[in-house]
Swiss-Prot record:
Pfam families named among the record's database cross-references: Transp_cyt_pur (PF02133)
Protein's name in the database: Nicotinamide riboside transporter 1
An example Gene Ontology biological process: 5-amino-1-ribofuranosylimidazole-4-carboxamide transmembrane transport
Function of the molecule: High-affinity pH-dependent nicotinamide riboside transporter which also transports thiamine with low affinity. Involved in 5-fluorocytosine sensitivity.
Source species: Saccharomyces cerevisiae (strain ATCC 204508 / S288c) (Baker's yeast)
Gene name tied to this protein: NRT1
Spans through the membrane: 48-68, 71-91, 112-132, 174-194, 197-217, 241-261, 273-293, 372-392, 395-415, 447-467, 484-504
Keyword hit for Cell membrane: yes
Length: 598
């Protein structure tokens, strides 16, 4: 057997089973199609829990430690976080509309903006961010697992470290990390739109756990401690102002990967009102309160124990080490269980499933959401997440770097949706190679240029954040401090300007029929589409299931006044290829385009 035949056989083995995919090509996958209206079940509480799960985590709890690096007082840091939440709401909700309007996820939205081939650019960046975020969340999840195991066994609490001193983790931490990965991997066998119940329960449980910790510490310390109220800002004047800007930018940067792929989950919403109210409440209330809880706990611990414990896991480790009582063990178990649930919910929704959706767009023939999520879990080890939490400055660097890369993508997507396309997209054209979103050789170079222009000025700032001795250019540093503002404006207006001076032709505004069952009959008619219930099963198969590409069936839809797509069969030796020919006439002009369907 030749090497090429071995490779071909291996690739066929890796293909998604035929029952789980609709067509054998690089553009189609069931996970990429719009969500059917029956699965759009996320109401207010589900949307609140989706973003609430991000806040009710150990990472958000300890985020107040960032104030140590920039010199702001803790009250100032909390206010800057509140302003950062407002910025996050603006960017996130503006970037939600592809999911609102057309029930599609981030992957198809990237095809609309960056092109059929160019979409890989934004998708790969989002995958890389998810992998880093996955490792970070999983590490904290492993520490939460250890809270549970510590409460079960005094021996495990004092488990000897058998790893090399040069490794920034212990044997016990490694055990918890592995267990968390295994438990999380089991959740990838459910559909993303079914995990809203896990999100809701984890938010409720962790909220009560956090409240319990803060109330207990505050009661024993007879107040919130002097650290919270008396800590003064160590910077003044313009440095203080830029520190404010930095904390606002950092706060959005830490959440920017989730804001970028917001349409992945906004498409599950039962109504726009539920999406708006749930998301806004979550991004305002828990996202502001949880950092306050973290600061209060560190302040009270400093008064009670002479140490500032920023991680809730460290608090319970201290309690169990000094008093392995039944009460301490019960508290460690239940709080550890709650934090484990919250870390799992955040990791699964914002990292695992997000990567699965993205990879399904890159390699739909070989990867579905489940496989992509498991890949993300495996590769997340490579980013060495145990190094992220060695110091507050390292944590800050990791979190702030997300925004430098992701904010320009958000800016381009928002500009394209509102100013260029006017919130009108053709879903079927996202599965057509040389169709509406082919642009120039499959790439919208305008979007690429706009992203580079917004991203590049922030890269030196990341290097400076890692090592302040690289250079002392205050302009570069200040740009990095306000990157979330500056990069957004640069990319937004560069893309808009390029589209004005180098326009591309928009020939298809939106589909004339709801081929994917994404809307109710009433919603479809409001959008000027023929409802799914009024389309023949034969036509639905032709447009969505790809049946005609394997059976050789030829389908010709009925013509309409405005547009008459005609499915024409052309043959090659081994393959049947179909083309959709669009013909449109009005009083001012007429044109026809031929688009290859794959």
């Amino acid at each position: 057997m030749s090497f090429s035949s071995i490779v071909s056989k291996f690739l066929r083995y890796l293909e998604i089973p035929a029952k789980n995919r609709t067509a054998v090509n690089f553009l189609r996958n069931p996970d990429l199609q719009p969500i059917k209206s029956a699965n759009q079940t996320w109401g207010f509480w589900s949307n609140l829990a989706y973003w609430g799960a991000v806040s009710f985590t150990a990472g958000t709890w300890m985020s107040g430690s960032a104030a140590l690096s920039v010199g702001l007082s803790y009250p100032e840091t909390i206010v800057s976080f509140l302003l950062g939440n407002v910025l996050t709401i603006i960017f996130t909700m503006a970037n939600s509309y592809p999911g609102y309007d057309w029930k599609i996820g981030f992957t198809l939205a990237q095809r609309f903006v960056f092109g059929i081939y160019g979409s890989a650019f934004g998708i790969i960046i989002r995958i890389l961010m998810s992998i880093v975020n996955y490792g970070s969340n999983a590490w904290l999840g492993g520490l939460s697992i250890n809270m549970i195991l510590d409460s079960w066994s005094h021996h495990y609490l004092h488990l000897p470290n058998t790893l090399s001193p040069s490794v920034a983790m212990t044997t016990k931490q490694l055990v918890g990390f592995i267990i968390f990965h295994v438990l999380t991997a089991l959740c990838y066998f459910m559909k993303p739109y079914h995990m809203n119940y896990l999100l809701i329960w984890s938010c409720v449980a962790t909220c009560f756990a956090m409240l319990g910790i803060v109330i207990y510490l505050t009661k024993n310390a007879h107040g919130v401690g002097e650290l919270f109220t008396s800590t003064k800002s160590t910077v003044t004047g313009s440095k203080r102002a830029w520190a404010w800007v930095y904390m606002i930018s950092y706060w959005f940067g830490s959440i920017s990967p989730g804001s970028t792929n917001q349409s992945d989950y906004s498409r599950f919403g039962s109504s726009n009102l539920a999406i708006w109210t749930g998301s806004v409440c979550a991004l305002l209330i828990p996202a502001t309160l949880v950092p306050i809880f973290g600061v209060i706990s560190a302040s009270t611990c400093d008064k009670l124990y002479g140490k500032q414990f920023w991680m809730p896991m460290d608090i319970f480790d201290y309690w169990l080490t000094n008093n392995y009582s039944a009460g301490a063990r019960a508290g460690a178990f239940f709080c550890g269980l709650c934090f484990t649930m919250s870390q799992m919910s955040s990791t699964i929704s914002n990292c695992g499933f997000a990567t699965g959706m993205d990879m399904a767009g890159l390699l739909p023939k070989y990867v579905d959401i489940k496989r992509g999520a498991l890949f993300c879990a495996c590769i997340s080890w490579a980013c060495l997440p145990w190094n992220f939490y060695n110091s507050s400055s390292t944590f800050l660097t990791v979190m702030s770097s997300f925004g430098v890369v992701m904010t320009p993508i958000i800016a381009v997507m928002i500009c394209d949706n509102f100013l260029i396309r006017k919130r009108q997209y053709s879903i079927t054209n996202a599965f057509i190679l040389k169709g509406e979103y082919y642009f120039t050789k499959g790439v919208n170079w305008r979007a690429i240029v706009a992203w580079v222009c917004g991203m590049a000025p922030g890269l030196p700032g990341i290097a400076w954040e890692v090592n302040n001795n690289y250079f002392h250019d205050s302009g570069i540093v200040k740009f990095f401090y306000g990157d979330s503002f500056f990069s957004f404006l640069i990319s937004f207006f560069v893309y808009w300007g390029l589209c004005v001076f180098f326009p591309f032709k928009i020939t298809v505004r939106h589909d004339d029929k709801d081929y994917y069952g994404a809307f109710t009959d009433e919603e479809a008619r409001k959008k000027g589409m023929i409802p799914y219930s009024e389309i023949s099963e034969e036509e639905i198969r032709a447009y969505t299931l790809g049946e005609c590409y394997t059976t050789g069936h030829e389908y010709k839809p009925e013509s309409s006044d405005n547009e008459s797509p005609e499915l024409i069969k052309t043959s090659s030796e081994n393959t049947n290829v179909f083309e959709i020919v669009h013909q449109k006439d009005d009083e001012k002009h007429s044109f026809s385009t031929t688009q290859q369907v794959v």
